[in-house]
UniProtKB/Swiss-Prot annotation:
Name this polypeptide is given: Ribosomal protein L11 methyltransferase
Annotated compartments: Cytoplasm
InterPro entries the record matches: Ribosomal_L11_MeTrfase_PrmA, Ribosomal_PrmA_MeTrfase, SAM-dependent_MTases_sf
Gene Ontology CC: cytoplasm
Protein role: Methylates ribosomal protein L11.
Record family assignment: Belongs to the methyltransferase superfamily. PrmA family.
A Pfam match: PrmA
Organism: Dictyoglomus thermophilum (strain ATCC 35947 / DSM 3960 / H-6-12)
């Protein structure tokens, strides 16, 4: 069997939304390369801008009967509609690859990931022991958040730090559902994951079932329609959407509740911190990993 491999270049701050959009458009899997600029097989030339650190290469795989020109047009349209100002996709091309080539290329990007007590394991991988580890089964590419991205890792680290047994958790922009699954496995009480995309909600439900945890997932635009209050709100999004969420998060966050945000690139950090201050959210800590930032706050009202 053959597949289409879609290859594109984009800025790092569009990496997360593009992965999510590709999944919505029917991608069978997506892989990211940060240090791709030495790959002369795929590209005829490399200029200095192309090789800058803030660019990534995205590979995404589609069934052979897919209209790839339509996929590219729809991808660009969604980016323009929802993320205008963040950039665009560049140097887009696609090619036919055989199933065995796709499978091998795909699996080499997915390995066991250890994040404190959490072990994130692709379904086809085996490890010698999971003793003292909390196992999360997660195949990459289903929707954003397979566990390997720095923003996801930092969110998992913060959940391990702040989540206490029985706490209720709201996961805004749940994507694959990985943060909801991790929260439940860490001992959370009620866990709800919300996402604006219906497909992401369906994928999250399947992942929860695979991990034998009972969670609630709901299609929602940020916190619209959410009535309950939570001990922890976690949001692995992008800076522009976090700014919108900051103005409404206290409505769903308990007094002294913890607010974990991630998906923030360096040049957007100051405006996020200013928004925390403007919305009277006390900043507890700021963490950085590979150019991405996580900001943790507290509701002190």
């Amino acid at each position: 069997m053959e597949y289409f491999e879609l290859i594109l270049k984009t800025k790092k701050d569009l990496e997360e939304p593009i992965i999510a959009i590709l999944e919505i458009l029917g991608s069978k899997g997506t892989a990211i390369e940060d240090n791709f600029f030495d790959n002369s097989v795929l590209w005829d030339y490399v200029d200095e801008e192309f090789a800058e650190r803030d660019y990534v290469l995205i590979r995404s795989y589609f069934d052979k009967d897919t209209d790839m020109e339509e996929i590219i047009n729809r991808l660009k349209a969604r980016i323009k509609e929802n993320f205008e100002g963040l950039g665009d996709v560049e140097d887009v091309e696609y090619r036919v690859v055989k199933e065995e080539d796709w499978a091998n290329e795909w699996k080499k990007y997915a390995k066991p990931i250890y994040v404190g007590r959490i072990l994130i394991l692709p379904s086809w991988e085996k490890v010698d022991t999971t003793e003292d580890k909390i196992l999360v089964i997660m195949d990459p590419g289903m929707a954003f958040g397979s566990g390997s991205h720095p923003t996801t890792i930092m969110c998992i680290e913060m959940l391990q730090k702040y989540l206490k047994e029985g706490m209720d958790v709201l996961d805004v922009g749940t994507g694959s559902g990985i943060l909801s699954i991790v929260a439940k496995k860490l001992g959370a009480g009620k866990v709800k994951g919300i996402d604006i995309d219906k497909k992401a909600v369906e994928v999250a439900k399947e992942n929860a079932k695979r991990n034998n945890v009972e969670l609630e997932f709901q299609q929602a635009n940020l916190t619209i329609g959410i009535e309950d209050k939570y001990d922890i709100v976690v949001a692995n999004l992008i800076a522009e959407i976090i700014l919108k969420l900051n103005s409404e998060v206290k409505r769903v966050l308990k007094e002294s509740g913890v607010y974990i945000t991630s998906g923030i690139i360096g040049e957007k950090l100051d405006m996020v911190l200013k928004s925390f201050e403007e919305n009277n959210i006390k900043i507890l800590e700021i963490r950085e990993k590979e150019g991405w930032f996580t900001v943790v706050g507290k509701n002190e009202d």
